[in-house]
UniProtKB/Swiss-Prot annotation:
Annotated domain remarks: The N-terminal domain is essential for RNAP assembly and basal transcription, whereas the C-terminal domain is involved in interaction with transcriptional regulators and with upstream promoter elements.
GO CC field: cytoplasm; DNA-directed RNA polymerase complex
Assembly and binders: Homodimer. The RNAP catalytic core consists of 2 alpha, 1 beta, 1 beta' and 1 omega subunit. When a sigma factor is associated with the core the holoenzyme is formed, which can initiate transcription.
SMART domains reported for this sequence: RPOLD
Reactions performed catalytically: RNA(n) + a ribonucleoside 5'-triphosphate = RNA(n+1) + diphosphate
Leading EC class: transferase
UniProt superkingdom: Bacteria
GO biological process: DNA-templated transcription
Pfam family, one: RNA_pol_A_CTD
HAMAP family (alphabetical): RNApol_bact_RpoA (MF_00059)
Keyword entries, A-Z: DNA-directed RNA polymerase, Nucleotidyltransferase, Transcription, Transferase
Protein name per the record: DNA-directed RNA polymerase subunit alpha
């Protein structure tokens, strides 16, 4: 099996909603393959939310005006197309705008329901004079890409319901370029640089993650034809390689205290890999192996970036009683009290 060096992905934040992502090194030719696929997916397939229809009080169609409002209905609709909104609901939801003049109507005047957020509250919608009054009902739905107003027109809709063009995509712009990069003596590897700009409703980082997930799901269809088919296998990352190497370490290298070491050896645990496959409950079942021994093991594994099978990822060694994280030492290194009748010395009480 051919093993390729694992590429790395780094992000350079350009602005609040714009980032440059660099993926390297890629096998020759894969820069364009990956770049084009990600770009097309980012522009067309990232889920978002948009207004699909509106209803303005006193208005029957879009080719008219509202008394006391500077903009006509067509202008109001054009303004509403620029609304940036996100919704957690899969079903259509309704928002309302009710404003009495004089003054301007902005997206900040919209009252959204729970689970819906308006991300550009300063966006201008309309201008009212002294006698102006504007009441708008907006329907928001989730979708992908662009849907014209004709497709948003529901059969049997009430009179006055005006369908709107929906721009669901939260991604504004995506560009990419491919450069040559060097790996050891070879200079024909690819470096892919993606420039992603989004609306306020999603970060560039999350948009790229969404595109990657979509492509993995689709390419998985081809892989399922034969999961044993030969291909290029991506090698482990440096962190993963370190973990793999750590699994083969003998537990002697953990520098455990006498009791903990002998208990584990008696139980048949000889390597770090065998140790991390155990849960805290498994270790507590070992004779003479108490909670303080478990704390010691967890601290030693944490130093290697590892943990027991059921240990939380948020484990903090400094929270362990008696352990000084700054020096890596125990305040009572020769003594444990594991509810076995008091504090006793390891070597003297070890039972084999």
């Amino acid at each position: 099996m051919l093993i390729s060096q694992r590429p790395t992905l780094t992000e350079e934040v350009i602005a609040e909603n714009r980032s440059k992502f660099t993926i390297e090194p890629l096998e020759p030719g894969f820069g364009y393959t990956l770049g084009n696929s990600l770009r097309r997916t980012l522009l067309s397939s990232i889920p978002g939310a948009a207004v699909t229809s509106i209803r303005i009080d006193g208005v029957l169609h879009e080719f008219t005006t509202v008394p006391g409002v500077k903009e006509d209905v067509t202008d109001i609709i054009l303004n509403l197309k620029g609304l940036v909104v996100s919704s957690e609901e899969d079903e259509p939801v309704t928002m309302y705008v009710r404003k009495q003049g004089p003054g301007t109507v902005t997206a900040g005047d919209i009252v959204p329901p729970a689970g819906v957020v308006v991300h550009n509250p300063d966006m201008h919608i309309a201008t009212l004079n002294d006698k102006g009054k504007l009441e708008i009902e907006l329907v928001v739905e989730r979708g992908r890409g662009y849907v014209p107003a004709v497709q948003n027109k529901a059969s049997g809709a009430e009179i006055g319901r005006i369908p709107v063009d929906s721009i669901y995509s939260p991604v504004l712009k995506v560009t990419y370029k491919v450069e040559a990069t060097r790996v050891e003596q070879r200079t024909d590897f690819d470096r892919l640089i993606l420039d992603v700009e989004t609306k306020n409703s999603i970060s560039a980082r999350d948009a790229l993650a969404s595109a990657g997930k979509t492509l993995v799901e689709l390419f998985g269809l081809a892989r399922e034809l034969n999961v044993e088919a030969e291909g290029i296998e991506i090698g482990p990352s440096p962190a993963e390689a370190d973990h793999i190497a750590s699994f083969g370490l003998p537990i002697e290298d953990l520098d455990l205290t006498v009791r903990s070491y002998n208990c584990l050896k008696r139980e048949g645990v000889h390597t770090v890999g065998e140790l991390v496959a155990r849960t805290e409950s498994d270790l507590l079942d070992i004779r003479n192996f108490g909670q303080k021994s478990i704390d010691e093991v967890k601290v030693k594994l944490h130093a290697l970036g590892l943990s027991l099978k059921d240990s939380p990822a948020s484990f903090d060694p400094s929270s362990v009683v008696g352990y000084d994280a700054s020096t890596g030492t125990w305040s009572d290194s020769g003594t444990f009290s594991d509810n076995d009748g008091g504090e006793q010395d390891y070597a003297e009480t070890e039972q084999l």
